[in-house]
Amino acid sequence: MNWYSDYKNECKKIIETVSAEIKKSELVIEKDTIQSMFLFELSKIELPYVFKGGTSLSKAYNLIDRFSEDIDLSMNRKLTQSERKTTKEQLIKIAESLGMKLLNPDQVKSRHDYNKYVFVYDSIFSPMPMEIIIETSFYQNVYPIGKHNIGSFVGNFCKNNDITIPVPFEAANVAMNVQSLERTFVDKVFAICDYYIQDMQDRDSRHLYDICKLLPEIKLDKELSYLIDVVRDDRMISKNNPSAQLKYNIPEMLKEIISNHFYERDYRDVTQKLLYEKIDYNQAINEGIAVVAKSDVFVYNK
């Protein structure tokens, strides 16, 4: 069985129509559709999965307008080892039910806090197999969370135009737990500081764009400052989150990132090409981390 089941020709026509109307490529519409089908199946499972990261900003909040192929998942409580094993089995089972194959089985270990599943699927629009990446991270609890509807290009197009498509598409209506905008904002600020300390900029400048888009939705107030301190305490535990250590001053580090143009080349060469809107590097900085750097919300108060 493949993701399009017995409806290959119908799916092809639907995706071509949506692609022409919303000015995004068929491959992007196709991948978004499969992501939604995956999340729909995941939403039926009892374990407390939480959808987070950049793709959630697009599919749950309709906030960003860039290409994102990853689905980032976590949980809102600590898992037992048995549940971790079950998680691995569930994700692979869902993928296989959609005709996808796991490319890196030897690199996925249920005992690990972080795993990257690389699945491939047969595309209607490409002779080459295409990838969908599912990332799971269980080293931190996810909070705050809320129930949100998960959108898709096909589902949104049908809803906006009052169209009923001639194929089953239950994934047009998906509701699941999603990490809050505030927490995603906090995580992304810490992430760009972590990568700066680790001298890693390749493909990480996308966070600058996301922060720029998140900031108008975020209040830089005492409530956010409290959340930042709580998240920082959690992040301190992991060696993979160096900027959470108290020896680092986040506002000053953001100023260094700006003055050193640390992410500029990657933003121009990679991130800007993934955007469906015109936001250049300077705008992303000036309307994003430059504003955060002038604020005191990331000053640790405990």
Model-derived features with residue positions:
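Glycine-rich beta-strand-to-loop/alpha-helix junction loops that act as flexible
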Residues: 51-55
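Structured mid-to-C-terminal alpha-helical surface segments
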Residues: 1-49, 59-65, 76-302
